[in-house]
């Protein structure tokens, strides 16, 4: 006999299969069901597939994000500003981990930063892979993350450690082997509850969805970025589309490397073979000894981070500050301290 609770879950899946959108409350209820190991995997797969085929709506992303936040292991940080640079991933371009490096640049200039990230699923190296290769202990606990934010202004939060409930959807996501709503929700579910963020999006069509969801979730400021030729980063190979979210308003514009005072770079120069190469190039770039193309790529993304956090009034000034910090080796010095702190040293 099916109880009323199970029936309500089934009806939500049925609603999706009929092409109807869910309210944020309904989406949160469905997400909570999907994070329950006892909920039927075939219904989980049906719901995820229906959302993907029809196209996820902002309210649905909001509901799923709220459900993940409710289940997260919290990192209790009380500062006025907290930055993240986590994006959706999935661009498949295998470029240097610019958003991870950008987080360190921003933190080295005094912007408190909790970088939320995971291992790679579609690229040669995810943010967690690179941080680990740099010597960082990605498995430290939440209390250490809080101490690091208080003393260094930086920490890295390895997503699986802070979202243990996500284990319940791993088998289904693996079988589907495609992007699902959880890829969109991940950047919006930082367990430290940051209030400013740069969110890279690999598909331009998803930019309004993420921007609207971020607005509904109450962020103070967000830049949703999509760079040529389809990267979830600020690009130095061409134009970057931006949706800027501030106080509930969304503004659309584009920037080029020239607008930031940075050189245009070929995509080939930014590609890496694996996490080892990405980490080594990030290490050299952050110490001011890297390739100029890597420096420009990192500086462009750091500029977005510094601007959204209110460190600089415009993106060009933010890029100049990022380049100066990199050439002075400030992010490398912070990285060294963060690695030691993550290990409890």
Curated annotation (Swiss-Prot):
Return the cofactor note field. Answer: Binds 2 magnesium ions per monomer.
Record EC number: 2.4.2.18
Q: List, alphabetically, the Gene3D superfamilies matched.
A: Nucleoside phosphorylase/phosphoribosyltransferase catalytic domain, Transferase, Pyrimidine Nucleoside Phosphorylase, Chain C
Give GO MF terms, alphabetically: anthranilate phosphoribosyltransferase activity; magnesium ion binding
Q: Which residues bind Mg(2+) 1?
A: 99, 233
For Mg(2+) 2, which residues are the binding ones?
A: 232-233
Which pathway does it serve?
A: Amino-acid biosynthesis; L-tryptophan biosynthesis; L-tryptophan from chorismate: step 2/5
Q: What InterPro entries does its record include?
A: Anthranilate_Pribosyl_Tfrase, Glycosyl_Trfase_fam3, Glycosyl_Trfase_fam3_N_dom, Glycosyl_Trfase_fam3_N_dom_sf, Nuc_phospho_transferase
Which UniProt keywords are given for this protein, alphabetically ordered? Amino-acid biosynthesis, Aromatic amino acid biosynthesis, Glycosyltransferase, Magnesium, Metal-binding, Transferase, Tryptophan biosynthesis
**Which positions are annotated as binding 5-phospho-alpha-D-ribose 1-diphosphate?**
87, 90-91, 95, 97-100, 115-123, 127
Cofactor(s) of this protein: Mg(2+)
> GO terms for CC?
cytosol
Q: Which residues bind anthranilate 1?
A: 87, 118
The catalytic activity, as recorded, is: N-(5-phospho-beta-D-ribosyl)anthranilate + diphosphate = 5-phospho-alpha-D-ribose 1-diphosphate + anthranilate
Annotated GO biological processes are: L-tryptophan biosynthetic process
Q: Which cysteines are joined by disulfide bonds?
A: none
| Signal peptide (residue range) | none
Family, according to the entry, reads as follows: Belongs to the anthranilate phosphoribosyltransferase family.
- Quaternary structure per UniProt? Homodimer.
The entry's function note states:
Catalyzes the transfer of the phosphoribosyl group of 5-phosphorylribose-1-pyrophosphate (PRPP) to anthranilate to yield N-(5'-phosphoribosyl)-anthranilate (PRA).
Q: What is this protein called?
A: Anthranilate phosphoribosyltransferase
Tell me what organism the protein belongs to. Aeropyrum pernix (strain ATCC 700893 / DSM 11879 / JCM 9820 / NBRC 100138 / K1)
């Amino acid at each position: 006999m099916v109880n009323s609770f199970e029936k309500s879950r089934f009806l939500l899946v049925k609603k999706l299969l009929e092409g109807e959108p869910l309210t944020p409350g309904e989406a949160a209820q469905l997400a909570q069901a999907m994070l329950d190991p006892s909920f039927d995997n075939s219904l989980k797969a049906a719901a995820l597939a229906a959302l993907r085929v029809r196209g996820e709506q902002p309210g649905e992303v909001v509901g799923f994000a709220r459900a993940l936040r409710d289940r997260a292991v919290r990192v209790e940080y009380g500062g006025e500003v907290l930055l993240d640079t986590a994006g959706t991933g999935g661009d498949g371009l295998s470029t240097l981990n610019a958003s991870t490096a950008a987080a360190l640049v921003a933190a080295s200039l005094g912007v408190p930063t909790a970088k939320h990230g995971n291992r790679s699923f579609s690229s040669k190296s995810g943010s967690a892979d690179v941080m680990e290769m740099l010597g960082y202990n990605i498995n430290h606990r939440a209390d250490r993350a809080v101490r690091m934010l208080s003393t260094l202004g930086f920490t890295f939060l390895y997503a699986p450690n802070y979202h243990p409930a996500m284990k319940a959807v791993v088998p289904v996501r693996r079988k589907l082997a495609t992007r699902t709503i959880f890829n969109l929700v991940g950047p919006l579910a930082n367990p430290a509850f940051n209030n400013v963020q740069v969110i890279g999006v690999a598909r331009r069509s998803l930019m309004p969805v993420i921007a609207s969801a971020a607005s509904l979730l109450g962020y103070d400021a967000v830049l949703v970025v999509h760079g040529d030729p389809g990267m979830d980063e600020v690009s130095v190979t061409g134009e970057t589309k931006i949706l800027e979210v501030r106080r509930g308003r969304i503004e659309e514009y584009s920037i080029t490397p020239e607008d930031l005072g940075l050189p245009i770079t070929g995509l080939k120069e930014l590609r890496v073979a694996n996490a080892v190469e990405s980490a080594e190039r990030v290490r050299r770039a952050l110490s001011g000894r890297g390739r100029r193309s890597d420096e420009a790529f990192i500086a462009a993304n750091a500029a977005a981070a510094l601007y959204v956090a209110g460190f600089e009034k415009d993106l060009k000034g933010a890029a100049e500050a990022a380049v100066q910090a990199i050439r002075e080796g400030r992010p490398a010095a912070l990285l060294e301290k963060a690695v030691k702190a993550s290990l409890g040293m």
